[in-house]
């Protein structure tokens, strides 16, 4: 392969994803008629509209990474025969997609089946956070629908390379403060005799990112609707109620009632900054918010959720969250020594209702992480699609389903325990 031209150097905040070769994927189960040629045309149009998706990463002379343009066209969609594993258009990709950031930052894999199929889009995390990635998938289905219904994928206007978080913050005049926001956890560091916990072994092989185990649950549309209405009644978002439920569940399962729980979650800065930032205008435009949960037998979920929201609002008002990403390092080491185990959860982002042709329907969506990291991961992610709340646990802990079922039980019983009944 001929050497490509350097587009730009990865920023400090993006380098962590290159260091651990982090990809995210969205697996979509489809029911109905699939037109492979139309999907291929839509995917090609997506890449043409976002040329950075056809690039790859190379190490730089200073030990960092460069985003490099390819001289060759992106290989396109990979189609796999569900019966025998035979592939076409995969450029040598094996039956289990091999993710290699030195080759490609984007892969699309389709496995057609009778009556539908499975579509998996993989994207390197240095180029897209969850919001950015969801918008790309939405655009892919929109272009596919246009090809099927009109024969044309729609206008192709090449977009500029997305900016790093650092570049966007500099444009908006956001500067690094002395405090990162993590200082609120200092009071509990080495303050408790923490029980020893087993650490599962995680084998990391550079150049071969591995799938992080994931367990998930869905709330029904009615359960999600009841939860949203309950939140509105108490002026709380689903995010806040879910966060409180996760923390209360973790407190019960840990059996260390006297130990506070540090909680960290990302905040999408696109709509926090002024002027707002378009979803694909930046790669990972995230701040970090923190909360120290002090929970007891009498803790009320509404009070806990309300305090989480109040803390976030205060941290946004003083600008701590907006600049928190400027304190990020490029190494991931899990919970710092002496600190009670962190709880991390993404926000319950509402996925767009994606356009599909009349004879095709999306039945399920599942997210996943791939990386080559030796530190066990333990995090929750949430989302809402088609009116249903999805909660996932990503990581290597034992019995993740136990925690998820306890969270579900709490979320589904809270409205009735408060005497709230939908009219």
Swiss-Prot record:
Catalytic activity: 2 a mycocerosyl-[mycocerosic acid synthase] + a phthiocerol = a dimycocerosyl phthiocerol + 2 holo-[mycocerosic acid synthase]; 2 a mycocerosyl-[mycocerosic acid synthase] + a phthiodiolone = a dimycocerosyl phthiodiolone + 2 holo-[mycocerosic acid synthase]; 2 a mycocerosyl-[mycocerosic acid synthase] + a phenolphthiocerol = a dimycocerosyl phenolphthiocerol + 2 holo-[mycocerosic acid synthase]
Residues the record marks as site: Important for mas ACP domain recognition: 313
Short name of one Pfam family: PapA_C
Domain of life: Bacteria
Entry's Gene Ontology BP terms: lipid metabolic process
Catalytic site: 125 (proton acceptor)
InterPro entries: CAT-like_dom_sf (IPR023213), PapA_C (IPR031641)
Keyword hit for Transferase: yes
EC number, as in UniProt: 2.3.1.282
Keyword field: Acyltransferase, Lipid biosynthesis, Lipid metabolism, Transferase
Site feature location: Structural role in the organization of the active site: 129
The keyword Nucleotide-binding appears for this protein: no
Enzyme class, first EC level, given as a word: transferase
Gene Ontology MF annotations: acyltransferase activity
Function text: Catalyzes diesterification of phthiocerol, phthiodiolone, and phenolphthiocerol with mycocerosic acids, the final step in the phthiocerol, phthiodiolone and phenolphthiocerol dimycocerosate esters (PDIM) synthesis. Can directly transfer the mycocerosate bound to the mycocerosic acid synthase (mas) onto the substrate alcohols.
NCBIfam families assigned to the protein according to its UniProt record, in alphabetical order: PRK09294.1-2 (NF006788)
Family statement: Belongs to the acyltransferase PapA5 family.
Quaternary structure, from the entry: Monomer. Interacts directly with the acyl carrier protein (ACP) domain of the mycocerosic acid synthase (mas) protein.
Domain statement: Consists of two structural domains that are related to each other.
Entry protein name: Phthiocerol/phthiodiolone dimycocerosyl transferase
Gene it is expressed from: papA5
